[in-house]
Amino acid sequence: MLTMSTLVSNPLFELSEVSVGQHFYWNLGGNEVHGQVLLVSWFVLAVIIGFGLTANSNLKPTPDGLQNLSEYVTEFIRDLAKTQIGEEDYLSWVPFLGTIFLFVFVSNWSGALVPWALIELPSGELAAPTNDINTTVALALLTSIAYFYAGINKKGLGYFKRYVEPAAFLLPINVLEDFTKPLSLSFRLFGNILADELVTGVLVALVPLVIPIPLMLLGLFTSAIQALVFSTLAGAYIGESLEDHH
């Protein structure tokens, strides 16, 4: 006889335990912060810093190994910044775009490659920092601050004339556009990474060995694309704030 207890004990119904929003909280200065996000973020920063120090500790005229990879990544980010911002101003923004790209890229891949679920926490579980909306909103707000700074630094208060160009009645639309940019950046990245991890988790629970492997490879690809999209849009917004409007 099929009883409620039988249904609840069925492994298929364990899929319902896949949930969003469970966190391991730290109390810092009377404020609760997501401890698991900070832990994995520190891991991501350690990987990036460790890679940079190791790859550039013994530079050779003919690069090989990690130095070769480091120079390839640097050239890639320089080209991205040059394309989006323009040849005149791009150099000063390479470090910012490089930091954004590497942090998002390594964060996304850490969620796909590192078995965080094996590390037990009092509550919640470790995951990619970009799996938390607070992280993606923070990155988007940093991008917003960057393109406002870029425009004001180059044009002074004249930067704000763009809101009434080419006609004053466009002011509300232009202001709204600047508010929607960080929203679209943050929710696009958060939604894609969260969806990828949830789908992978469900399929691993259903078919642990075969089906998840190609899906995980696809997840690595989409994670890299999301890092590229985020940094490309950040560069495009900065370039837009720097260009002359006539």
Swiss-Prot record:
A single GO cellular-component term on record: proton-transporting ATP synthase complex
- The coiled-coil regions, if any, are none
Q: List the disulfide bonds.
A: none
Q: Which UniProt keywords apply?
A: ATP synthesis, CF(0), Chloroplast, Hydrogen ion transport, Ion transport, Membrane, Plastid, Thylakoid, Transmembrane, Transmembrane helix, Transport
Compartmental location = Plastid, Chloroplast thylakoid membrane
UniProt topology in membrane: Multi-pass membrane protein
InterPro entries on file: ATP_syn_F0_a_bact/chloroplast (IPR045082), ATP_synth_F0_asu (IPR000568), ATP_synth_F0_asu_AS (IPR023011), F0_ATP_A_sf (IPR035908)
What PROSITE patterns would the database entry show? Answer: ATPASE_A
Q: Which residues cross the membrane?
A: 33-53, 99-119, 133-153, 201-221, 222-242
Q: Which GO terms describe its molecular function?
A: proton-transporting ATP synthase activity, rotational mechanism
Per the entry, what this protein does is: Key component of the proton channel; it plays a direct role in the translocation of protons across the membrane.
Output the PANTHER family linked to this UniProt entry: ATP SYNTHASE SUBUNIT A, CHLOROPLASTIC (PTHR42823:SF3)
Q: How does it assemble?
A: F-type ATPases have 2 components, CF(1) - the catalytic core - and CF(0) - the membrane proton channel. CF(1) has five subunits: alpha(3), beta(3), gamma(1), delta(1), epsilon(1). CF(0) has four main subunits: a, b, b' and c.
Among HAMAP family, the record links this protein to: ATP_synth_a_bact
Q: Which family does it belong to?
A: Belongs to the ATPase A chain family.
Q: What is this protein called?
A: ATP synthase subunit a, chloroplastic
Q: Which organism is it from?
A: Oltmannsiellopsis viridis (Marine flagellate)
